[in-house]
Amino acid sequence: EVALLLADSGVVAIASLISPFKEGRDRIRAAHAAAGVPFVEVFVDTPVSVCEKRDPKGMYALARSGEITGFTGVNSPYEAPTDAELVLRPSDGDAVAHAIAIMEILTP
């Protein structure tokens, strides 16, 4: 909602969210459309194994051991986006290349 308010006032708002269900993503997309505000979905398609390797807090290990429940990708489902405007994969480039791709789609 904050991103929608910012975008409505002309600010490019970037929100990094875990949105595990298509229904939630569709709801946000529809809210933007209803407000006449552009919406760009970027799917950072990273395998769970890579996420685990990059996890500095050990949250994936805690989820796998059962100490954390409802953890997306481990013991709670994740519905991968099928209609994202941009899909980024770790194997396709580094963080700088991905940032450039995002900026290009936001500022055509």
Please provide the spans of the model-predicted regions.
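Small-molecule kinase domains that catalyze NTP-dependent phosphoryl transfer to phosphate-bearing small molecules
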Residues: 45-101, 108
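ATP-dependent NMP and nucleoside kinases share a basic, alpha-helical "lid"
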Residues: 1-64, 70
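Generic structural signal for well-ordered alpha-helical scaffold segments
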Residues: 1-4, 103, 107
